[in-house]
Regions:
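Short alpha-helical segment of the dimerization/phosphotransfer core of two-component systems
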Residues: 8-18
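Short beta-strand/loop element within the Bergerat-fold HATPase_c
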Residues: 101-111
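Conserved polar catalytic motif of the HATPase_c/GHKL fold
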Residues: 87-92
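A conserved beta-strand-to-alpha-helix junction within the catalytic ATP-binding
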Residues: 36-51
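Conserved glycine-/histidine-rich ATP-lid loop and adjacent helix of the Bergerat-fold HATPase_c
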Residues: 156-172
């Protein structure tokens, strides 16, 4: 029993180390872009997400529709990083070859604008959704185009939110993973 506890503790430390390394990689990936705080139009951000989806989905061989519901509001943040966040969510969703619908919507939530990215093709529990933001060896062993590492999209998104917390001066920016309400 003592050996088992020791082995489990060692395994936990090992995975914490991996998580730290991957978070550092995500952070370094974002360091290449200087954080530029500005006022961003939500409809403009959504238009770019639609354009990116069309480009990323071209030739995939699955019937996936992408609908958006923007609101005429503005957010404070880094335009390039927010665009990159949406592109990462789209890339991850399109890595699953299923027909169906993906929705992107925005809504006012107190002082914040809530962005809702919903993949209607998949059903996951809250726990399964939250696990997407942690390292998963199986997801990461799959390589994408040009040999790029896959399965880190959500880690990058998490790091973008952390950067916005730090640099935009608005604490409380979060990614909440929750099942869609039908």
């Amino acid at each position: 029993e003592k050996e088992t506890v020791s082995a489990i503790s060692e395994l936990i430390e090992y995975y914490k180390g991996i998580f730290t390394i991957l978070s550092s990689c995500a952070s370094r990936q974002l360091e290449e872009v200087t954080f530029r705080r500005g006022i961003i139009s939500v409809p403009e951000l959504f238009a770019l997400a639609e354009k990116y989806f069309r480009k990323a989905n071209k030739g995939k061989g699955v019937a996936v529709s992408f609908s958006t519901r923007a609101i005429d509001e503005r957010v404070v943040g880094d335009f390039i990083q927010l665009r990159f966040l949406l592109e990462n969510l789209i890339d991850e969703a399109l890595s699953v070859p299923l027909d169906g619908e993906i929705h992107l919507a925005a809504a006012v939530d107190g002082e914040y604008i809530r962005f809702l990215f919903t993949d209607m093709r998949r059903t996951k529990t809250r726990e399964e959704l939250n696990q997407l933001f942690y390292p998963n060896l199986e997801r990461m062993m799959a390589t994408g185009e040009k040999g790029e590492l896959r399965g880190t999209e959500y880690l990058v998104c998490k790091q973008i939110i952390r950067d916005h917390d730090e640099f935009a001066g608005k604490r409380g920016c979060r990614i909440n993973a929750e099942p869609a309400e039908n």
